[in-house]
Amino acid sequence: MTPPEGKAAPSMSTVIRDENDKVFRLDSLQGRPVLVNFWATWCPPCVAELPALDNAAKQLGDDVTLLLISVDRGGRQKALPFLQDRGITRPLMGFDPKAALSREMGVRGLPTSFLLSADQRQSWAYVGPREWDSAPMIAEIRNLLRLAKASPVPSRQNSQDHLLV
């Protein structure tokens, strides 16, 4: 589910915890594009796409900030060692064990990802795993970031599995 056209994505001030167990809010990243990925350790498609997300973060560099948000009930204590054991270190990490942020953003299945423009508007949403580090996906993300800069509200439907709002 995506926010109505032209609206900021909800819940920018909902509090979650970061990898250092400090309070973290999405709006603290305002001014930078953010790729937000909701995932869980018990979700096989989520786990399968983690290395590709980590590689995509390396390829995109400073163009976009990757934020992985675990919805595991065990929170940081469960998800952080899981990520570290797999060598996933590049993205920012957030922990939403009560699923407050995921509910407010309309997450209905895992994995779910949102691309937020620098002004915190949702550019698109994906439900399901993706080949994040593939050349076509990296090119699509960069194109969407260009569109978001050029127009405050780009709008088109690209396919059935993701919307550009």
Per-range role (PLM):
Residues 1-7, 146-165:
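Compositionally biased, proline/threonine/alanine/serine-rich low-complexity intrinsically disordered stretches
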Residues 84-90, 96-146:
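Thiol/disulfide oxidoreductase modules built on the thioredoxin-like
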Residues 1-26:
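N-terminal "domain-start" segment that seeds a small globular fold
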Residues 47-86, 97-104, 139, 154, ...:
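Structural microenvironment flanking redox-active thiols in thiol-disulfide oxidoreductases
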Residues 15-21, 48, 93-96:
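Short gly/ser/thr-rich secondary-structure transition/capping motifs
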Residues 25-47:
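Short active-site neighborhood of thiol/selenol oxidoreductases, capturing the structured segment around
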Residues 34-36, 67-69, 114:
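Conserved hydrophobic packing residues within short motifs/helices of P-loop NTPase cores
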Residues 31-34, 62-65, 90-91:
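Loop/turn elements at helix/coil->beta-strand transitions in domains of secreted/extracellular proteins
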